[in-house]
């Protein structure tokens, strides 16, 4: 910041003018985003910070502090940010949470305190959180003795949704959930006088973290993801396709109103620009290969959606067909599939009166083939082969995911069932491991899910904490199976499948601002992983194998 060092009448004039500015305006002008943070008008994300940013609150609704070095959460530590609705405190160094630590946060709904080095949580640490709906304490293991009684009672009384609190001891409670403990009445009563020291101990909760296995995984990886290339623009979706032995990538860029097509450069060993399809608020670019023809469905929020075809004489994509605006108002996803050697695609419509529609190729063009349910604001569509039968799974903001089955007689999709107890699912993706069908279901806040088909229904395999997730994408490179879980509030997580435990384990954290899609691309015996970013730069990671013998 430059300081005024001049004197005279001009200096006095500037000083007088400054005094006329309201104090709040002066503070707002001086406010800066700390070097360790990333700030927008509504959110702050800090990595490795030693303090809570003292930024003028404005409309700040979410604050994320990750890998911080501060040692305690003091009383009223966040009271200068009264508009907070989400507070994420993950993988920090603090050991103590004091009484009234979150005082002043009357609108806080989501509080995540996972994977820290907590030793003590004061009895009144959560006092004043009247609007709290979600609390997550995972990554901490509790000694479920008398010192945990206050938390046990609080869990019984709170209306908030609280993650499972697992007990590490004593032996009779080991691996049990704290809220499933019968009672502390017998263990925590005495006929003798209770000393002040005993009372103080009863107000504290001792935790111990068991990170040995996790540290081992990170110290001895067999593979890794490293940044290969950074693209200087925002994006919301990435699709890949092959044509004539070359690999291409289509990237939707709504802010630049482009569908950028990249090709792999075999000489420079990176992805370079090949063509650019312009439009209005493009949210999706989906490639369709039919015989020797290459089409790209370009979904737009305004001006209708269109289909482009690659013209070899012009060596570029040219408009081939319009998609009527009356059917698709707010496209949110495009899914390509084949049934009986015929090519279809579906556009999920997320508008209030949306009408998700299936389109079919008829050798001359694509025409609307079947309109699915309306008024459900569909956010995603996934084509799935279940026991040899074709199905569509539609996720929606207004109901649980529904399953439609292809009727061979009518050659239309008909309702077949749903996935119960899975409200607010944004996206559904299918994948297979060892011939077993799995689904990944994305939730923005709460828990995303991995589910498995057991020949009768989909059953839960694993819950993954979601912190502002818009995508949970499965992908594989050779025998390595991964899940990428995006986050708008902290690091995105890459999970790797553990064959022995039959679950996904945390493998690596990557930082991508507001990730919207993850896409695997392989070429020249190299494997890449595109991470689109709605608010920052699009990143391309390379999957590498680490030789531990070196």
Swiss-Prot record:
Pfam families given in the database record? EPTP, LRR_8
Name of the gene encoding the protein in the UniProt record:
Lgi2
Which residue numbers delimit the LRRNT domain?
Answer: 26-62
> Which parts are the LRR repeats?
83-104, 107-128
Task: Report the protein name in the record.
Answer: Leucine-rich repeat LGI family member 2
LRRCT domain residues are 140-190
Expression by tissue? Brain.
Which organism is the protein's source?
A: Mus musculus (Mouse)
Question: Is the Disulfide bond keyword given for this protein?
Answer: no
């Amino acid at each position: 910041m430059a300081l005024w060092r001049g004197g005279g009448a001009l200096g006095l004039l500037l000083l007088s003018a400054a005094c006329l500015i309201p104090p709040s305006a002066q503070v707002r002008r001086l406010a800066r985003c700390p070097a360790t943070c990333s700030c927008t008008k509504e959110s702050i994300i800090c990595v490795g910070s030693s303090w809570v940013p003292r930024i003028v609150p404005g409309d700040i609704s979410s604050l994320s502090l990750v890998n911080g070095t501060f040692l305690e959460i003091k009383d009223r530590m966040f009271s200068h940010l009264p508009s907070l609705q989400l507070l994420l405190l993950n993988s920090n160094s603090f050991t103590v949470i004091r009484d009234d630590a979150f005082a002043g946060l009357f609108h806080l709904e989501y509080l995540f305190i996972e994977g820290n080095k907590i030793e003590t949580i004061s009895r009144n640490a959560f006092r004043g959180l009247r609007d709290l709906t979600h609390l997550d304490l995972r990554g901490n293991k509790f000694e479920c003795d008398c010192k945990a009684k206050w938390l046990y009672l609080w869990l019984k009384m709170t209306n908030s949704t609280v993650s499972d609190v697992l007990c590490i001891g004593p032996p009779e409670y080991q691996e049990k959930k704290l809220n499933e403990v019968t009672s502390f009445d017998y263990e925590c009563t005495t006929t003798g006088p209770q000393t002040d020291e005993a009372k103080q101990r009863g107000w504290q909760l001792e935790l111990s973290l068991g990170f040995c296995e996790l540290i081992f995984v990170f110290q001895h990886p067999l593979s890794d993801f490293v940044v290969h290339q950074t693209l200087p623009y925002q994006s919301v979706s990435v699709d890949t396709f092959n044509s004539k032995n070359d690999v291409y990538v289509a990237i939707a860029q709504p802010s630049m109103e482009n569908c950028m097509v990249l090709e792999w450069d075999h000489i420079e060993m990176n992805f370079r620009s090949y063509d650019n399809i312009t439009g209005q608020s493009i949210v999706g670019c989906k490639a369709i290969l039919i015989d020797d023809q290459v089409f790209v469905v370009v979904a737009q929020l305004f001006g209708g959606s269109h289909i482009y075809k690659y013209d070899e004489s012009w060596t570029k994509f040219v408009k081939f067909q319009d998609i009527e605006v009356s059917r698709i108002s707010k496209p949110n996803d495009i899914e390509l599939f084949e049934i009986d050697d015929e090519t279809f695609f579906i556009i999920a419509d997320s508008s209030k009166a949306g009408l998700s529609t299936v389109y079919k190729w008829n050798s001359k063009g694509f025409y609307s083939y079947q309109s699915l349910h309306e008024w459900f604001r569909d956010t995603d569509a996934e084509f799935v082969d279940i026991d040899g039968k074709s199905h569509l799974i539609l996720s929606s903001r207004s109901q649980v995911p529904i399953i439609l089955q292809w009727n061979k007689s009518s050659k239309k999709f008909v309702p077949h069932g749903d996935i119960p107890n899975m409200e607010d699912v944004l996206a559904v993706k299918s994948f297979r491991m060892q011939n077993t069908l799995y689904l990944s279901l994305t939730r923005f806040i709460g828990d995303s899910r991995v589910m498995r088909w057991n020949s009768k229904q989909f059953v839960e395999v694993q819950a993954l904490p979601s912190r502002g997730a818009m995508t949970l994408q499965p992908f594989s490179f050779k025998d390595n199976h991964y899940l990428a879980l995006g986050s708008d509030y902290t690091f995105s997580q890459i999970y790797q499948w553990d064959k022995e435990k039959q679950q996904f384990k945390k493998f690596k954290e990557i930082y991508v601002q507001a990730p919207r899609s993850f896409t695997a691309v392989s070429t020249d015996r190299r494997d890449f992983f595109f991470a689109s970013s709605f608010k920052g730069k699009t990143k391309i990671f390379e999957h590498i194998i680490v030789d531990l013998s070196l």
